[in-house]
Amino acid sequence: MALKTTERAPKTSRVSARDRLLAAADELFYAEGVHVVGVDRIVERAGVTKASLYNTFGSKDELVRAYLENHFRRRQARVAHILAANKTPRERLLAVFGEVEDLLAGSAFRGCRFISAAAESQPGDAGAVVADEYRAWLWSLFTDLAKEAGATDAKQVGRQLFLLYDGAAVAARMDQDRGAAAKAVKSAAIALLDAAVPPKRRGRRAQ
């Protein structure tokens, strides 16, 4: 007698509710804004229930926090990789702006997530808090890189580079010719650095 066999469905990797919610939030928040997108849209896109969202994050505000913190960690990891791949302080700083240039020119760029979230948030909201933390880190990064490159007033140069980054991100989002901002940002960083670092220091810092 032939034995009956039962076909089993192939195993598929299960994506956690947290990851599905973060993926949905990432897509919707970045495209439309953290304030405009409601919980109903998020859970529908993620394919989960409202209860799952609240059990996982507690509130929409905490989902916003997780969404931004996730991108904060990714940005830190990318920058760490860039710094490790370049030898001199000048090369490291300009490589960071080279990555910014590529980011702004990308077809998927819709502005800085942190600037957008902060603009929609009230003081104390998760979006504002994480945006402040990210921007403090970014300013510190530019200041440290300027100091290592030999800038006479590293704090001031760090602030100038920070404002350059902000301005380029806004211009790339608002202007129709997004590539113009992308092309200008690295050359502007070079000009700032050259003006801030005395020629004698450039040679020593490049070693």
Describe the function of each predicted region.
Residues 153-172, 184-191:
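Hydrophobic alpha-helical segments that form the core
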Residues 69-76:
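Short, basic, alpha-helical segments at the C-terminal edge of helix-turn-helix-like DNA-binding modules
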Residues 76, 91-95, 124-148, 159, ...:
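Amphipathic alpha-helical packing segments from all-alpha helical-bundle domains
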Residues 105-126:
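Amphipathic alpha-helical segments used for helix-helix packing
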Residues 66, 80-108, 158-161:
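Hydrophobic alpha-helical connector segments
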